């Protein structure tokens, strides 16, 4: 058992050094939106309901590319508006004895929220834009009803925070590069909750590889953890 743990630790250490950019990316229409949501959405039920969701432009591109009701012109307009930005959606609520929700006000969420970004080596604090860009405001207004139909009251009470995804030489948060986003929230009494961690690269954006045993290999893996065989 000790040797197995040592081997797994070695696999994980090597995996952290994998260059995802060398692997084949999926076309937007082939991205599994549900799988991508699983990688970018985190939920805690500590003293209520707490949900945080990082939404990159790739999410919208994948969603719109699969929607036959959206024209090419409308799709381009939306994606051009979103390009250069990502979003974080947060909803927090107390849950009553009968299952009723009492949602946190936006100010309370902002007060208890802390965002940190890692490049795989160091962490740095980041912050959302103080104001929503003009072009994005109409889009955010229609997201509430859409999420409400999909998630009920939780979706209707989502709070959206916009991040400027542009930086010199690339993107602030790239779902294709090694790193992590840490989202820390607090409850309504000010107690810090266990942070949410979203790790990159996102496996859902890549054409899957398979280990010899047929199990899927995460995009960050260099070798298969079950038998140590090298992945292509």
Task: Describe the residue ranges of each PLM region.
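Bacterial N-terminal signal peptides
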Residues: 8-17
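Bacterial N-terminal signal peptides that target proteins for export
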Residues: 1-8
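Conserved functional micro-motifs across diverse proteins
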Residues: 21-220, 225-232
